[in-house]
Curated annotation (Swiss-Prot):
Disulfide bonds join C46-C61, C53-C65, C60-C74. The lineage of its organism: Eukaryota, Metazoa, Spiralia, Lophotrochozoa, Mollusca. InterPro entries: Conotoxin. GO terms for molecular function: ion channel inhibitor activity; toxin activity. Belongs to the conotoxin O1 superfamily. Expressed by the venom duct. It comes from Conus arenatus (Sand-dusted cone). Its main location: secreted. This is Conotoxin ArMKLT2-01. The keyword DNA repair does not apply.
Length: 81
């Protein structure tokens, strides 16, 4: 029984030492991944031009929603050179 416990402890110790050398900066990489996923969740996407929008509360990329009797369409704004 004692031999089994010693073998298990040695195996765990060797496994932990081997895995410890695999990642140089695990905390830094983990926080960067977390930040990227939070940014994606918090990023607000706008409605593209010519898609339907709500005239009272629109989120058009162009910034303009043309009211067409209750429903609206995001305005297509030409780029002037």
């Amino acid at each position: 029984m004692k031999l089994t416990c010693v073998i298990i402890v040695v195996a765990l110790f060797l496994t932990a030492c081997h895995a410890k050398d695999k990642q140089e900066h695990p905390a830094v990489r983990g926080s960067d991944d977390m930040q990227d996923s939070e940014d994606l969740k918090l990023a607000k996407k706008c409605t593209v031009d010519s898609d339907f929008c709500d005239p009272d509360n629109h989120d058009c990329c162009s910034g303009r929603c043309i009211d067409e009797g209750g429903s609206g369409v995001c305005a297509i704004v030409p780029v002037l050179n």
